[in-house]
């Protein structure tokens, strides 16, 4: 069974979420014949449900939205309007104005506007230390000159073309017994449901009822906030007549750092050391995210292997809303070996005397063959394999160029 966020529309058609296009069409035709208003006058609402479900699921883009996000995905992807709002209310129990999980209507019964989403890019330093910054946004506010009416009192009239719904609904017959309900934004009122004569329109907003205004938000980035976390400003989104403003929601986007990588409340870094440091101990200093100079010491006699990881407790990220508790810092060591011929050959024996003894080489009985180790570049692949591939390509080309299908070169 397909993994989907909601199955209501599939249930209406009586098909599983993984149904194919043909299965959807077959189910729709069967139900449309059964509940068509001409055949069953009392099943008008049921027929609308069936038509709506098929319209969504037969459209690949709408179906993907619905499968991934359910009702919420359709609410986001739809422009709203009277007719569509009615069918949403009937099927899902709410209007189109419940954007991003918010209720379609507020407690006082007013419709609720859409939320405004904005990314907020934050450095790792600011997420470690916390920061207060100002963000400038442009939003719609009710026109003060006409109090959001768009014109003088009594000038606003219901659009006769769409009867005040803002959309026009059309039913198109696809085949005998198969129809599709479609809707489009009313061109006469641009989806407003209302019209104002040009001479009566407000001079300031030109009848649009709202004007653009710059809003300065003071944003508090708390210590320990994480990538994807939300900062919400309630009721600060666009204003519209008769609609309660939605929220401005900022999504924290953590910037990449040149030294540290974050994993929850832990930090990771890579530090390069030489062979002598790996064998004889070391000390190094690095600058932390709060500008402290941290000294790391490792005692002589304890060996650091290439790629090994050591941990510094309590030097990770502060916990969100509990900043005195911190994660850990993990340091991965990249041991840099000397270049070839870095030491005088006469000194190699002295160096070998200082290092642990070589393992004993077992005696091999029988014939042996000595081979040479060569440099290998993993990005270029195996040389032998390339030669074989080149040979095969050459043979194929020659075969296709000079002989018929299946004919091979004769051997002398």
Swiss-Prot record:
Zn(2+) 1 binds at residues 143, 146, 202, 205. The modification N6-acetyllysine is found at residues 39, 152. It is a lipid-anchor. GO terms for molecular function: ATP binding; ATPase activator activity; Hsp70 protein binding; protein-folding chaperone binding; unfolded protein binding; zinc ion binding. The modification Cysteine methyl ester is found at residue 409. Keywords: Acetylation, Chaperone, Isopeptide bond, Lipoprotein, Membrane, Metal-binding, Methylation, Phosphoprotein, Prenylation, Repeat, Ubl conjugation, Zinc, Zinc-finger. GO terms for cellular component: cytoplasm; cytosol; membrane. A zinc finger (CR-type) spans 130-214. Zn(2+) 2 binds at residues 159, 162, 186, 189. The keyword Endoplasmic reticulum does not apply. It is found in: Membrane. There is a cross-link at residue 134 (Glycyl lysine isopeptide (Lys-Gly) (interchain with G-Cter in SUMO2)). CXXCXGXG motif repeats lie at residues 143-150, 159-166, 186-193, 202-209. It comes from the Eukaryota. Disulfide bonds: none annotated. GO terms for biological process: carbon tetrachloride metabolic process; protein refolding; response to heat. Residues 365-412 are annotated as: Disordered. The modification Phosphoserine is found at residues 78, 123, 394-395. InterPro entries: DnaJ, DnaJ_C, DnaJ_domain, DnaJ_domain_CS, DNJA1/2-like, HSP40/DnaJ_pept-bd, HSP_DnaJ_Cys-rich_dom, HSP_DnaJ_Cys-rich_dom_sf. Pfam families: DnaJ, DnaJ_C, DnaJ_CXXCXGXG. The keyword Lipoprotein applies. The modification Phosphotyrosine is found at residue 391. PANTHER family: DNAJ-LIKE-2, ISOFORM A-RELATED. This is DnaJ homolog subfamily A member 2. The lineage of its organism: Eukaryota, Metazoa, Chordata, Craniata, Vertebrata. The gene is Dnaja2.
């Amino acid at each position: 069974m397909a993994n989907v966020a909601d199955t209501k529309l599939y249930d209406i058609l009586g098909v599983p979420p993984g149904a194919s296009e043909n299965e959807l069409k077959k189910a729709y035709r069967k139900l449309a014949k059964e509940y068509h208003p001409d055949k069953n006058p009392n099943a008008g609402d049921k027929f609308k449900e069936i038509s709506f479900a098929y319209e969504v699921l037969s459209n690949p883009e709408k179906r993907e939205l619905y499968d991934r996000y359910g009702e919420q995905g359709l609410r986001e992807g739809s422009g709203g309007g009277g007719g569509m709002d009615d069918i949403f209310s009937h099927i899902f129990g709410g209007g189109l104005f419940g954007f991003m999980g918010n209720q379609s209507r507020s407690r006082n019964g007013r419709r609720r506007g859409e939320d405004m989403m904005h990314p907020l890019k934050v450095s790792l330093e600011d997420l470690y230390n916390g920061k207060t910054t100002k963000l400038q946004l442009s939003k719609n506010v009710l026109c003060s000159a006409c109090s959001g009416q768009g014109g003088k009192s009594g000038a606003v009239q219901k659009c006769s073309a769409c009867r005040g719904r803002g959309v026009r609904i059309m039913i198109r017959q696809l085949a005998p017994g198969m129809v599709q309900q479609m809707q489009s934004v009313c061109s006469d009122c641009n989806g407003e449901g209302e019209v104002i004569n040009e001479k009566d329109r407000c001079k300031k907003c030109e009848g649009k009822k709202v004007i653009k205004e710059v809003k300065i938000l003071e944003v508090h980035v708390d210590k320990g906030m994480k990538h994807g976390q939300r900062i919400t400003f309630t009721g600060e989104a666009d204003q519209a007549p008769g609609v309660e403003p939605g929220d401005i929601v900022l999504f924290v986007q953590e910037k990449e750092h040149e030294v540290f990588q974050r994993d929850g409340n832990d930090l990771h870094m890579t530090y390069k050391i030489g062979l002598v440091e790996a064998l004889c101990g070391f000390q190094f200093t690095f600058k932390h995210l709060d500008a402290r100079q941290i000294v790391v010491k490792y005692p002589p006699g304890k060996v650091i292997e290439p790629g090994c990881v050591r941990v510094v407790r309590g030097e990770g990220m502060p916990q969100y809303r509990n900043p005195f508790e911190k994660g850990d810092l993990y340091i991965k060591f990249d041991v840099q070996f000397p270049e070839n011929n870095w030491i005088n050959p006469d000194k190699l024996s002295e160096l070998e005397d200082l290092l642990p003894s070589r393992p004993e080489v077992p005696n091999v009985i029988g014939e042996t063959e000595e081979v040479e180790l060569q440099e290998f570049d993993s990005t270029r692949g195996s040389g032998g394999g390339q030669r074989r591939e080149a040979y095969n390509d050459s043979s194929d080309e020659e075969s296709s160029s000079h002989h018929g299908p299946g004919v091979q070169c004769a051997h002398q």
